[in-house]
């Protein structure tokens, strides 16, 4: 199933079955596992203006594609935060196979409980309700000028410094770029 089909099924499930929508964005599970296509990963990191040596956190890192790309193509250090042990294992194996263990690590746990204060950039592909739940943590712990990049789902109440439209195959994406200290 391609990305467009995954998102269509997710949208249908959320609209038809409110209980499905409540399953994510509650407790610790912030989103279903829908990998971001590689061209969108790269566009997100470009939109964040990631620089060599900066620290990128990816919330809900899945198979590790964002943190791996941040290290390989942008020269950044990166931390992926993923709640599912199976995805942490897959990501860790990929990182080791690519020899990136000195610049990339995966933390198994909740994005709601991780210390984000060292981050220069935070990326995420979570639901709007999950973004709302994370917003107080982002506001409290991220230092001014930290960039927050959300794929597809805006952070309600924040004004993006940039909204990037991108395509991967037939699917269109909205990439919301925020900067702490300039979200109003």
Which residues fall in each region the model found?
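Class I SAM-dependent transferase core
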Residues: 17-51
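C-terminal substrate-binding/active-site "lid" region of AdoMet-derived donor-dependent transferases
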Residues: 129-184
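A short SAM/SAH-binding and catalytic strip from SAM-dependent methyltransferases
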Residues: 117-133
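Conserved SAM-binding motif I beta-strand of class I
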Residues: 77-82
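S-adenosyl-L-methionine
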Residues: 85-118
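Conserved class I S-adenosyl-L-methionine
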Residues: 53-62
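Bacterial N-terminal signal peptides that target proteins for export
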Residues: 1-9
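Glycine-rich SAM-binding Motif I of class I
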Residues: 64-68
């Amino acid at each position: 199933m391609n990305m467009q089909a995954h998102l269509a099924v997710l949208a249908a499930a959320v609209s038809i079955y409110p209980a499905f929508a409540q399953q994510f964005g509650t407790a610790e599970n912030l989103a279903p596992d829908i990998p971001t296509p590689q061209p969108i990963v790269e566009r997100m990191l470009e939109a964040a203006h990631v620089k060599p040596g900066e620290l990128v956190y990816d919330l809900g890192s899945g198979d590790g594609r964002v943190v791996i790309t941040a290290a390989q193509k942008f020269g950044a250090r990166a931390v992926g935060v993923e709640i599912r042990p199976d995805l942490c294992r897959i990501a860790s194996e990929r990182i080791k196979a690519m020899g990136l263990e000195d610049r990339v690590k995966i933390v198994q746990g909740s994005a709601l409980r991780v210390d984000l204060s060292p981050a220069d950039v935070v990326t995420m592909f979570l639901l709007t309700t999950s973004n709302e739940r994370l917003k107080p943590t982002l506001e409290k712990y991220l230092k001014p000028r930290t960039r927050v990049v959300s794929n597809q789902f805006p952070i309600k109440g924040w004004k993006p410094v940039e909204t990037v439209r991108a395509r991967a195959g037939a699917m269109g994406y909205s990439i919301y770029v925020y900067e702490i200290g300039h979200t109003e």
